[in-house]
Regions:
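Phosphate- and other anionic-substrate recognition elements at nucleic-acid/protein interfaces
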Residues: 101, 105-108, 125-134, 146-147, ...
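Phosphate/pyrophosphate-binding loops at sites that engage ATP/ADP/AMP, CoA/4′-phosphopantetheine
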Residues: 108-122
């Protein structure tokens, strides 16, 4: 807005005065209660969630069909290959440095360098901030809304999941599930 005014001049003294005085901002922030009432409650939560682990196998010894998932987030890109039995065979996590497509291409090249004979990527899906870009640019089979992807993942571990908290690179989302 200031740039739209012609010939707006401010002396150095005036600029210093403006910078030294506190900026008054009038707004209200609605705050939530803490997620955990106590440290003990937090550790109980951690203990319960640590019981659910994704089984992991070595991609180099795997034979069969795999599924490729890509989460092109606003700050990081994640990729995974999952076997027919739900085991994690490959994972990739990297800051995308403002280039989710370039980072995803890097991940795909890494996958193909490691992909053994007898392994076939039969389905691919993207999600996240760059979901549509990645799906279109790399001609993936489908794209999925990030919150729906979170639900599928959470329901894999707990079919009765009723709350998902996503703390992402640029925002936070709380999903309450009612079925």
């Amino acid at each position: 807005a200031l740039n739209s005014k012609k010939d707006l001049r401010v002396s150095l003294q005036e600029m210093q005065n403006r910078l030294e005085n506190k900026i008054k901002m009038d707004f209200e922030v609605e705050r939530m209660e803490p997620l955990f009432a106590s440290e003990a409650e937090y550790y109980t939560f951690k203990e319960r969630h640590d019981k659910h682990q994704v089984p992991v196998k070595d991609l180099s010894t795997y034979h069969g069909k795999v599924f490729l998932g890509i989460d092109a987030g606003s700050t990081t890109t994640k990729a995974a290959l999952v076997g027919e039995d739900g085991t994690l065979l490959y994972s990739f996590y990297h800051n995308n440095d403002g280039d989710p497509l370039g980072t995803t291409i890097h991940a795909i090249k890494d996958i193909y360098r490691q992909l053994p004979e007898g392994v076939e990527i039969v389905h691919s899906c993207s999600t996240g901030y760059g979901e549509a870009l990645i799906k279109s640019a790399l001609m993936l089979d489908e794209g999925e809304v990030e919150t729906v992807s979170h639900y599928y993942a959470a329901a894999f571990f707990d079919p009765e999941v009723d709350c998902i908290l996503d703390i992402g690179g640029q925002d936070m989302k709380l999903s309450l599930i009612h079925i």
